[in-house]
Amino acid sequence: MPEGYTHVRTARKAAHAIHYKVRCPEAFAAGANGPDVFFSFEIWKRPRSRRFDLPALGSRMHEEATGAFLQSLLRHVKTGAQVEYTLGFLSHYAADTLLHPYVAAVCEPGGPYAGKGGHGYFEIALDSTLHAEDTGVSQVPADDACPLPKGEDLAEITLLLQQALRETYGAEVSAECLADAFYYFNRVRRLFTSRHGLRRGLFYVVETFFGGRGFLTGHVSPRALALNLPDDWTDPATGQQHHGGAFALLKQAERLSALYMTGALQHWMGVLPQTDIVKLLGSRDYGTGTETERSTAPAAGPAAPPPDAAGPTEPQPSTDKGE
């Protein structure tokens, strides 16, 4: 993660920066939530009781064959909804790989979000802060964080995901499970708004007995952001020192998202060769922002089609300079 609204906001700002007119906003936002959509699928069931363990697959997608999955999405795009889902997904990848190391840093011992559940508390506080900045209201409605794609758009997105998941991870996931994942993601998110704190208090009690601190309350908005966030920090994964805190990193994420979107559009239009889009996107772990043996692993599923089979046919992706 970050949380949903942060991802959707980052993707929208990136699209605006390159004058791309979003025509399927729910599909675009669904892509901006990336693999996180899978984490709510039948979460109330034990993994072995689920129709498919999508939460485990979502975790795998953050760490394994990340670049191969992005290339598979790019290769199988055919429709407008699929174009915009993929553009949103590229933004999710950009934001996660830039912001996650900072999230890990502020959750280290001595950091403002050290302790049980700190990761979630920071991310929902950032979500609440950005939503308040944009709308004047810090409570984040589900339809702002994860609007639900419907009808033909949803069918086209699930088809794209089926192809990419099969090709990259060898995972055969039904269209019904994928469609339900988007539905559950939106519905579960609706449980985590608590304007007057009643649900937060209830979830706090539940956490005492199930799941541990932050399992539920780490997703509840509104939440105030700590005032002592560092601008200078050390990446726990690499030991590298950085200057620039959460809001500077958000601006970087918008720029990187815009770069990835531009690259994808140019690739589909035949301007950017396959080797260049592979180099541009890389294959980084979503959590550390670095390339690892696992993140750079090749696709585990059936062989991909030749490069000349790639690219959307209709409608073509377009930009609108009037936006």
Language model region names:
Residues 1-86, 93-323:
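N-terminal leader/auxiliary helical segments
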